[in-house]
Amino acid sequence: MDTRNKAQLLVLLTLLSVLFSQTSAWPLYRAPSALRLGDRIPFEGANEPDQVSLKEDIDMLQNALAENDTPYYDVSRNARHADGVFTSDFSKLLGQLSAKKYLESLMGKRVSSNISEDPVPVKRHSDAVFTDNYTRLRKQMAVKKYLNSILNGKRSSEGESPDFPEELEK
């Protein structure tokens, strides 16, 4: 029962704090009241010179408030800012595109210059691949001949090479 009362008290305090925080902030967000500084509230015991100086003070405050009531942004300033942001982003994009084109041109020159200047490494590579494949094929053919000779019982007298291991080492 004691924990239930504590929980209820906690909920009540939370609700009251929310309510109090909203009501204390409420005057900041509501519409201005009909009573303005320019509206006179007559009070007793005030003489005429006091009211004149009071009126001048009220007029100064109203002018200051009228200036502060207008929004603090300037449309031309926002337009200039938007133009500046656009120009900055656009120049970054153009810089990236030009860098990309320059890199592609360098890559194209490098590839084309290697082929036109030095065709020998390409020929050497293709020759090496051919030689490797040909050597592999010869070894496979030698293995087939040797296996056929063993399976069929043929010997070197019929024209087979007795030096099979030497053929594989070539």
UniProtKB/Swiss-Prot annotation:
Biological process per Gene Ontology, one example term: body fluid secretion
Subcellular location: Secreted
Signal peptide start and end residues: 1-20
The keyword Phosphoprotein is assigned to this record: yes
Primary location group: secreted
Residue positions, PTM Asparagine amide: 152
Sites bearing Phosphoserine, chain numbering: 76
Pfam family, one: Hormone_2
Propeptide segment residues: 21-79, 156-170
Keyword Cell inner membrane assigned: no
InterPro entries: Glucagon_GIP_secretin_VIP (IPR000532), VIP/GHRH-like (IPR046963)
An MF annotation (GO) of this entry: type 2 vasoactive intestinal polypeptide receptor binding
Domain of life: Eukaryota
Gene3D superfamilies for the chain: 6.10.250.590
Function: PHM-27 and PHV-42 are two bioactive forms from proteolysis of the same precursor protein, that cause vasodilation. PHM-27 is a potent agonist of the calcitonin receptor CALCR, with similar efficacy as calcitonin.
Family, per entry: Belongs to the glucagon family.
Protein name (Swiss-Prot/TrEMBL): VIP peptides
